[in-house]
UniProtKB/Swiss-Prot annotation:
This is 2,3-bisphosphoglycerate-dependent phosphoglycerate mutase. InterPro entries: His_Pase_superF_clade-1, His_PPase_superfam, PG/BPGM_mutase_AS, Phosphogly_mut1. It catalyses: (2R)-2-phosphoglycerate = (2R)-3-phosphoglycerate. One of its GO terms (biological process) is gluconeogenesis. The active site is at residues 9, 87. It comes from Methanospirillum hungatei JF-1 (strain ATCC 27890 / DSM 864 / NBRC 100397 / JF-1). Keywords: Gluconeogenesis, Glycolysis, Isomerase. The keyword Cell wall biogenesis/degradation does not apply. HAMAP family: PGAM_GpmA. Catalyzes the interconversion of 2-phosphoglycerate and 3-phosphoglycerate.
């Protein structure tokens, strides 16, 4: 039996402002810092230990990991950062307020952009200054691999091969792994682990800063999974994520 823990980063400044963030490198809000520390404390109090951590190359996930490591006195464990764990790329929606976008394009269209499996938002133009190929952190990556927009299907396509080739073998070797990432990169992994259909995946919402624990069998198939937190608070947090793109 193997144990894997997934955590979506704590609330970011743009989560608080209800803006599409994607690959924009936005930091944690004060509440997000508190969420990350609370996650680390909960993991420590429940006796969890980790040998290795994976995260994205975006500071909201990295800082969440730092705060968890600090709370658990695990600053020393190896950390692997990879763009393949980045949030889904929101293309031309990046930076826009979700409610204002609903008012402009309609709730149904925004829901499709946010939650459909295979329909991406409008793409960045190549000359956009947020084009990932302009950023030093992505210079070692082939330009053809860097997205200008993504749907969840695209996020699955870049993350799950990395899971199969890099992370899964480490877990099978007996290492206890922690992954701090983003709402959609974690939705991609949960879809894979739980074999969620393309039709049902739009209904999956992952709250910020709450550890999601998986107990996996020898084939890395889930035996059970659960959030490490008060059940009602978890449900309320999921509902809040669900309602981010709804007109008020």
């Amino acid at each position: 039996m193997y144990t894997l823990v997934l955590i979506r980063h704590g609330e970011s400044l743009w989560n608080r402002e209800n803006r599409f963030t994607g690959w924009r490198d936005i930091d944690l809000s004060p509440q997000g810092i508190d969420e990350a520390r609370a996650a680390g404390k909960a993991l420590r109090e429940q006796g969890f230990e980790f040998d290795l951590a994976y995260t994205s190359v975006l500071k909201r996930a990295i800082r969440t990991l730092w705060l968890i490591q600090e709370e658990m006195d695990l600053m020393w464990i190896p950390v692997i950062r990879t763009w393949r764990l980045n949030e889904r790329h929101y293309g031309a929606l990046t930076g826009l307020n979700k409610i204002e976008t609903v008012e402009k394009y309609g709730e149904q269209q925004v829901h499709i952009w946010r939650r459909s499996y295979d329909i991406p938002p409008p793409a960045y133009t190549p000359d956009n200054l947020d084009n990932p190929s302009y950023h030093r952190r992505y210079q070692e990556i082939k330009r053809s691999d860097l997205p200008m927009t993504e749907c969840l299907k695209d996020t699955v396509a870049r993350f799950i091969p990395y899971w199969n080739d890099e992370i899964a073998p480490v877990i099978r070797s007996g290492k206890r792994v922690l992954i701090t990432a983003h709402g959609n990169s974690l939705r991609a992994l949960v879809k894979h682990l739980d074999n969620i259909s393309d039709t049902d995946i739009p209904d999956l919402n992952i709250p910020t800063g709450i550890p999601l624990v998986y107990e996996l069998d020898d084939n890395l198939k889930p035996v059970r999974s659960y959030y490490l937190g008060d059940e009602e608070k978890v449900k309320a947090a999921m509902e809040a994520v669900k309602n981010q793109g709804k007109a008020k």
